[in-house]
Regions:
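Solvent-exposed coil/turn segments that connect beta secondary-structure elements
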Residues: 61-63, 72-74, 82, 90-91, ...
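Short histidine-centered loop motifs in beta-beta connectors
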Residues: 72, 88, 104-128
């Protein structure tokens, strides 16, 4: 009977630098809104569409800057109106993977807690176009979409803008 012997693992010849994650920027929304990217023309429909179909589990107000909508993880998140992506990344710790879209009327919509982002900064998007997949990134204990509407950088109640 023969016995197989294993060779010790080879030792690396050089040391890799340790990974340093990018710094989180507390002013991501403000900086993105200051970007001068031009949004495409609005659809003219008047009201924005809901970015997902789900159950609203948290409403605007009382310290909440938007609404939280419960949806299964991986649900397509769609642009509420034509616009241009002014931010797509994970620099907002509480929201994790987040997309910000500026619209022709100056409003900015925020889509947080995505499991993946399907667009990039500077990209023009159409109403109803998939921009992300819902998830649990950031600080959340269940899959959802955090959705905000901002006017002049200040959060406003999304219900007045949605059809």
């Amino acid at each position: 009977m023969t016995t197989a012997t294993t060779q010790p693992a080879a030792k690396p010849t050089e040391t890799l630098a340790s990974y340093t994650p990018p710094k989180k920027d507390a002013k991501v929304i403000q900086q993105a809104e200051d970007d001068d990217a031009v949004a495409p023309d609005a659809t003219g429909i008047g009201k924005m569409r809901w970015p997902v179909r789900g159950r609203v589990i948290s409403n605007f107000g009382g310290g909440k800057d938007g609404v939280d909508i419960a949806v299964p993880e991986g649900t397509p998140v769609k642009a509420a109106e034509n616009g241009v992506v002014i931010y797509a990344g994970d620099g907002l710790k509480e929201f994790g993977n987040t997309v910000l879209v500026r619209h022709e009327n100056g409003l900015v919509t925020v889509y947080g807690h995505a499991s993946s982002i399907e667009v990039q900064r500077g990209q023009k998007v159409k109403r109803g176009q998939e921009i992300a997949l819902s998830g649990m990134s950031g600080t959340t204990d269940s899959p959802k979409l955090h959705f905000e509407v901002r006017k002049n950088s200040a959060p406003v109640d999304p219900s007045g803008y949605l059809e």
